[in-house]
């Protein structure tokens, strides 16, 4: 179930502060964050945010189509290596 519209979008305060500093300084350095639950805001468009996927930080360039989605949607946490091979076919 989506978040109530009367509550508004959620963004961690420490991430919001880093985004505001990057916009004020016109910084192009990636912003490192562990906050996968934060919603992409219009202020973030054009910034590179390094989102933690549980093992490393994945750099993601934010564009207009990502606004309203959560940061965690853009850093995949699971890697599918394929199903196990059929042992009968090897005989």
Swiss-Prot record:
PROSITE patterns, per the entry: RIBOSOMAL_S19
Alphabetic keyword roster: Ribonucleoprotein, Ribosomal protein, RNA-binding, rRNA-binding
Record-level GO BP terms: ribosomal small subunit assembly; translation
Pfam family, one: Ribosomal_S19
Disulfide bonding pattern of the chain: none
GO cellular component: cytoplasm; small ribosomal subunit
GO molecular function annotation: rRNA binding; structural constituent of ribosome
Function in brief: Protein S19 forms a complex with S13 that binds strongly to the 16S ribosomal RNA.
Membership in a protein family: Belongs to the universal ribosomal protein uS19 family.
Protein name per the record: Small ribosomal subunit protein uS19
Species this chain originates from: Halorhodospira halophila (strain DSM 244 / SL1)
């Amino acid at each position: 179930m989506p978040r109530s519209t009367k509550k508004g979008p959620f963004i961690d305060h420490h991430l919001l502060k880093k985004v505001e500093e990057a916009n004020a300084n016109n910084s192009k350095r990636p912003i490192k964050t562990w906050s996968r639950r934060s919603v992409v805001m219009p202020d973030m468009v054009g910034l590179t945010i390094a989102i933690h996927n549980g093992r490393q930080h994945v750099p993601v360039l934010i564009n207009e189509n990502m606004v309203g989605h959560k940061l965690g949607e853009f850093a995949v946490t699971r890697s599918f290596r394929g199903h196990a091979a059929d042992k009968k076919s090897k005989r």
